[in-house]
Amino acid sequence: MSKLLEESLKTCPIVKRGEYHYFIHPISDGVPLVEPELLRDVSTRVIKMIDTDVDKIVTAEAMGIPIVTAVSIATDIPYVIMRKREYLLEGEIPVHQETGYSKGELYLNGINKGDKVIILDDVISTGGTLVAIINALKRAGADIKDVLCIIDRGNGQNIVEEKTGYKVKTIVKIEVVDGKVNILE
């Protein structure tokens, strides 16, 4: 299996904002450049890890979108984006989201009761986004089959499981130490 994702993480820039060290990577930030080879590698690995017998893939705005698009094209599974603004469509479900760096609302549309779904996102750190997505999908009556994040940084997997009962699959677990990304698994 290709390790393009891991190799690209080891060399990505780190930016300090306050006391937090952000890693800047094409999968999590869309900069400096998203290479098709990396997106193909990641989406291929995702497809091998998820239940593809589903009706829809769900992600949150914004950086889950490139990954979900690639997976959708390869599997012919349509996707839904939870947006950061409301559209006032009938049946729209608002849900509060709190992450390690922001708070706000997410809005779910396009999910029907009984839809079999998978959740796919770019990074999990605090778990706040995934908890919000899961809560909205439960309110909609969806059947959540899989939850997967590409990059795991932090304790978010445990938090999501404690708060929702869902296990989060990840491709790679990292930490940022001394200005660089270390691959843990």
From Swiss-Prot:
Cellular localization per UniProt: Cytoplasm
Gene Ontology biological process terms in this record: IMP salvage; purine ribonucleoside salvage
Gene3D superfamilies referenced in this protein's UniProt entry, alphabetically: 3.40.50.2020
Pathway participation: Purine metabolism; IMP biosynthesis via salvage pathway; IMP from hypoxanthine: step 1/1
One Pfam family cited in the UniProt record for this chain: Pribosyltran
Broad class of where this protein is predominantly found: cytoplasm
Protein name per the record: Hypoxanthine/guanine phosphoribosyltransferase
